[in-house]
């Protein structure tokens, strides 16, 4: 077994850029330490090990951010990012209060602009909106979209199982729709997009379904390596098990931590179009951009998800990055990264007007 692990590590190093390999290998090491065999999680140690950055009202590389609690009853917080306003850099400490007191009550903008509601990854268990990797990613989204990003600090498993993350996502969407500054173009609602990676992509899907059910307009969904599963193993799961950072044993642990205690992996949260799932034909479901890493062991599931949406009559664009692994979009050091950022920018612009 040790020899097999060494072969997998060496193969991985030949494909993955060094900085990405180090980053994700460190995550994997810490994740293995934090997960307990009995299904519980070392939360205090996990919080200590998670590299985080504070919000910055004073601009950093042209982007300002601030944290805001949107549901006191569960302590649900979001981090809001926007392009720095003129004069922000000179305001110093005074800028800390201005966004919260004034930005949330700004008058509607004259032109449509994207608002990306983002759900961080971490398999429903790890990371947060303030994790360094996701703070950086959201800043990139602001720059490429010239809009606003609302990153959701949803409740995590195993302390908060299904459907807590979905409920928090829905709360965030409703909150965004209620804010004066989230309006544009003759007082119309701003153009809202749902996005996330890993478990965040899964959350984005389920929030998008609820939005379609309840008549809330979402302009598009952007899913990066969305986390789906099922009881029957796919070809890519068998072929890539343990080869590029992730094992089936890892994935099974996370699903057991998130799903209801008596559920298996064909629960609709995990397998939305599986035997217990629901088809979306006839539903006004938003257009989707689905980013798939060819070396992610769940890539077959993501492609099957896209096929199911198409079969139900929905618009889907799949960008399949054959030689990319999980997390490739976190660092700007591959051709795939730049291609995907361009695809995201094009998708936002194409769906901004309706």
UniProtKB/Swiss-Prot annotation:
One of its GO terms (biological process) is positive regulation of gibberellic acid mediated signaling pathway. Keywords: Gibberellin signaling pathway, Hydrolase, Nucleus, Receptor. Its EC number is 3.-.-.-. Gibberellin A4 binds at residues 122-123, 134, 198, 327. GO terms for cellular component: cytoplasm; nucleus. Belongs to the 'GDXG' lipolytic enzyme family. Functions as a soluble gibberellin (GA) receptor. GA is an essential hormone that regulates growth and development in plants. Binds with high affinity the biologically active GAs such as GA1, GA3 and GA4, but has low or no affinity for the biologically inactive GAs. Upon GA-binding, it interacts with the DELLA protein SLR1, a repressor of GA signaling. This leads to SLR1 degradation by the proteasome, allowing the GA signaling pathway. This is Gibberellin receptor GID1. It comes from Oryza sativa subsp. japonica. The gene is GID1.
């Amino acid at each position: 077994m040790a020899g097999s692990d060494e072969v997998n590590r060496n193969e991985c190093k030949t494909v993955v850029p060094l900085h990405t390999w180090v980053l994700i290998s460190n995550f994997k090491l810490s994740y293995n330490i934090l997960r307990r065999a009995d299904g519980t999680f070392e939360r205090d140690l996990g919080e200590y090990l998670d590299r985080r950055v504070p919000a910055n009202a004073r601009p950093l590389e042209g982007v300002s951010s601030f944290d805001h609690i949107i549901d006191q009853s569960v302590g649900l917080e979001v981090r809001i990012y926007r392009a720095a306003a003129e004069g922000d850099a000179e305001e110093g400490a005074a800028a800390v209060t201005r966004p919260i007191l004034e930005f949330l009550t700004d008058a509607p903008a004259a032109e449509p602009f994207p608002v990306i509601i983002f759900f961080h990854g971490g398999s429903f268990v790890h990371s947060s909106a303030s994790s360094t990797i996701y703070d950086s990613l959201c800043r990139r989204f602001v720059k490429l979209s010239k809009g606003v990003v609302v990153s959701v600090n949803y409740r995590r498993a195993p302390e908060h199982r299904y459907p807590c993350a979905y409920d928090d996502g829905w709360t965030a969407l409703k909150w965004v729709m209620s804010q004066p500054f989230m309006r544009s173009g003759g007082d119309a609602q701003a153009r809202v997009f749902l996005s996330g990676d890993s478990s965040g992509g899964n959350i984005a899907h389920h929030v998008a379904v609820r939005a379609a059910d309840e008549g809330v307009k979402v302009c598009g969904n952007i899913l990066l390596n969305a986390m789906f599963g099922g009881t029957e193993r796919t070809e890519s799961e068998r072929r890539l098990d343990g080869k590029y950072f992730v094992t089936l044993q890892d994935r099974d642990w996370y699903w057991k931590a998130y799903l209801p205690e008596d559920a298996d992996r064909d629960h609709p949260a995990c397998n939305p179009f599986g035997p217990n799932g629901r088809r979306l034909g006839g539903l006004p479901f938003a257009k989707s951009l689905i980013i798939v890493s060819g070396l992610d062991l769940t890539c077959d599931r993501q492609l099957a998800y896209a096929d199911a949406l198409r079969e139900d009559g929905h618009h889907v664009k799949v960008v399949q990055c054959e030689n990319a692994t999980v997390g490739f979009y976190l660092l700007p050091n591959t051709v795939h990264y730049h291609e995907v950022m361009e695809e995201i920018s094009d998708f936002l612009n194409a769906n901004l007007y309706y």
